[in-house]
């Protein structure tokens, strides 16, 4: 059943909008790429504003959009229009994948985002978000307002990354976002699967680099 009232979700959304991130502001100004804030907030209302004990934050959507946009811009500057392959672990409701899809769309660059999660894409369920107040939905239904981006850029895969990633064919992974399991062993496994298919200049972005909460991620990255 829904975890909160509509009023509570809207209150949380209003509060998280007030957060400021000077380092991300500087990053956006330095690169010249920044996601449309209103677009981001609307997507987050349906995919990131949830009931949980830890503080709400979806600033990683800004980082992903800017990092991928800069990567695309640098490739386009060398006249490379090669179709990009992007991997994401930890789809959840689809927020991060859509932020990356928006970067591809805004820079008019071909690419495919393969996103992996244990949660099914086409099974009706509650998602701990404001949409639960309507009725249980599949992820596909939850993301219907952004269905054009989903159709053009995103492929959803269900399963444990330890079992699924080795079976997925990809000669090269240009860009990756790791937000799946947060143990050192799992992060290193995903990293090893990706780095073997990357070339100099390709990127991996890690979520939740916080020593107190996720020391395994910090250890893997460092």
Where are these regions (language model features)?
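Generic detection of intrinsically disordered/low-complexity segments and helix-coil linkers/edges
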Residues: 3, 33, 200-203
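N-terminal auxiliary segments of SAM/dcSAM-dependent transferases
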Residues: 1-31
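S-adenosylmethionine/decaboxylated-SAM
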Residues: 9, 13, 38-40, 44-55, ...
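Short alpha-helical hairpin
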Residues: 25-45
């Amino acid at each position: 059943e829904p975890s909160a009232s509509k009023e509570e979700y809207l209150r949380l959304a209003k509060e998280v909008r007030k957060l400021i991130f000077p380092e991300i502001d500087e990053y956006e100004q330095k690169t010249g790429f920044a996601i449309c804030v209103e677009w981001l907030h609307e997507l987050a209302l349906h995919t990131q504003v949830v009931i949980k004990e830890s503080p709400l934050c979806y600033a990683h959507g800004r980082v992903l959009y800017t990092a991928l946009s800069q990567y695309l811009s640098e490739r386009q500057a060398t006249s490379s229009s090669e179709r990009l392959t992007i991997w994401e672990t930890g789809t959840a409701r689809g927020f991060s994948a859509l932020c990356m899809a928006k970067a591809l769309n805004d820079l008019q660059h071909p690419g495919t985002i393969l996103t992996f999660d244990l949660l099914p894409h086409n099974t009706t369920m509650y998602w701990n978000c404001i949409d639960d107040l309507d009725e249980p939905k599949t992820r596909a239904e939850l993301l219907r307002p952004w269905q054009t981006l989903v159709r053009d850029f995103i492929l959803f895969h269900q399963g444990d990354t330890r079992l699924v990633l080795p079976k997925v064919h990809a000669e090269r992974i240009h860009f990756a976002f790791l937000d799946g399991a947060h143990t050192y062993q799992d992060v290193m496994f995903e990293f090893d699967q990706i780095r073997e298919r990357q070339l100099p200049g390709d990127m991996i972005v890690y979520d939740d680099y916080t020593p107190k909460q996720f020391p395994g991620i910090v250890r893997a990255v460092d």
